[in-house]
């Protein structure tokens, strides 16, 4: 009899464990009028990635992504924006991202054509492939000092983007990152850049102010700067001008000036 009682208690405990909120893998919840799907990133933790499921034609204007969400009595921390989370949501004009977000996954905001402003937090470390591709109304975007990884084509065809500054935390600009940014006027690269990928600034013909303070020319491809004005003044460290003049990719430019 005692064995049966112990077994019964064990089965109850197991059932309670299996129903624990931390065993949930995904759930839906609504915040500020927007319905989202939340997926637990690592099993048995309370960190989740968020994806919008409200239909795109019903979501317009400003969107504020929540930093936390409560489901079945458990608080979950929203730490990632999922793959294609808002892709094609062409009515969104402004996006506020909470300070809990560290990763924006691939194509998260792709073709959000009305998006003019994105407020992103300092802890953000990763922007995925093609995350903001085709955000043709986006005029300004500041890469925070916490950014350490950009994905391929992340700002491709952001045709209203006018300037970009790369923080010292970032060592690589990937292929096609700013390809087709036809309004881009200013590029500022700090001292720690190592590589700039194929077609990273392809077709950025409107750039008039280009500064790269990295002493050794970052590794580039022959097409990295293709389509830019070859005669625009490029500011580099005074002691390294000749290195830039002869480096692959950088030899595209004819007008170097020292700083």
Where is each model-derived feature located?
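Extracellular/surface-exposed low-complexity segments
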Residues: 5, 19-23, 233-259
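Short beta-strand/loop segment at the start of cytosolic alpha/beta domains
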Residues: 24-55
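Acidic, Ser/Thr
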Residues: 53-56, 69, 85-86
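Structural signature of tandem-repeat unit edges
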Residues: 40-48, 58-80, 90-103, 112-126, ...
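Consensus positions within tandem repeat domains that build extended binding/scaffold surfaces
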Residues: 83-85, 105-108, 128-133, 151-156, ...
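Bacterial Sec-dependent N-terminal signal peptides
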Residues: 2-34
